[in-house]
Curated annotation (Swiss-Prot):
It comes from Gemmatimonas aurantiaca (strain DSM 14586 / JCM 11422 / NBRC 100505 / T-27). The record marks 92 as: Stabilizes the basic form of H active site to accept a proton. This is Peptidyl-tRNA hydrolase. Pfam families: Pept_tRNA_hydro. One of its GO terms (cellular component) is cytoplasm. SUPFAM superfamilies: Peptidyl-tRNA hydrolase-like (SSF53178).
Length: 190
């Protein structure tokens, strides 16, 4: 089973913040794939369905960002399940301009507390992550304090840029599900 974790913070006050782009994307996947409603699942809400012939579970941690890794505990005990092949994390990335994304098979958390928590639970940096850019393209918009920046509502023009790349991100995720990490990552260069 493939597990896709969308990182974000619970609560209405965080719904439209930059830090919740992982939730925006996972909600879009749920709708596109016609999965059932979210259900309580430990420290998360989740839903499961088929994408093609592959069983996929979508997971939204209900902890705050720095505790997100706790949702992985049940999968770490599954025979044959490996994070390198069966997990993808959807996350905001301040080093990538808004309107762009990066798909990597492994990497560092880059100061992201959600990824730090994931890696602490996995005891490994080797798992696919799709980093959705949140860095402003308008140089007049300064990042300043990082925590303040990621927890502020994303302006409409930037949200539109994320919406514009969502179909391409979904294509990359569907390729990962069907053909694996290497194929999905290599398709990014085309």
């Amino acid at each position: 089973m493939k597990v896709i974790v969308g990182l974000g913070n619970p609560g209405r006050e965080y719904e439209n913040t930059r830090h919740n782009v992982g939730w925006w994307l996972i909600d879009t996947l749920k709708e596109r794939w016609h999965f059932e409603p979210w259900r309580k699942d430990g420290d998360a809400v989740s839903t499961t369905g088929l994408v093609g012939t592959k069983k996929v579970k979508l997971v939204k941690p209900q902890t705050y960002m720095n505790l997100s890794g706790s949702v992985l505990r049940p999968y770490l005990k599954r025979e044959g399940w490996t994070a390198a092949q069966d997990l993808m994390v959807l996350v905001d990335e301040v080093a990538v301009p808004v309107g762009e994304y990066r798909l990597r098979a492994a990497g560092s958390p880059g100061g992201h507390n959600g990824l730090k928590s994931i890696e602490a639970h996995l005891k490994s940096p080797t798992y696919p992550r799709l980093r959705v850019g949140i860095k402003p393209v308008d140089e007049r918009r300064q990042i300043g304090d990082l925590a303040d920046f990621v927890l502020h509502t994303m302006p409409r023009d930037e949200r539109a840029l994320v919406d514009d790349i969502t179909p391409r991100m979904i294509d990359a995720i569907e390729l990962w599900i069907a053909e694996g990490t290497e194929k999905a990552v290599s398709s990014m260069g085309r």
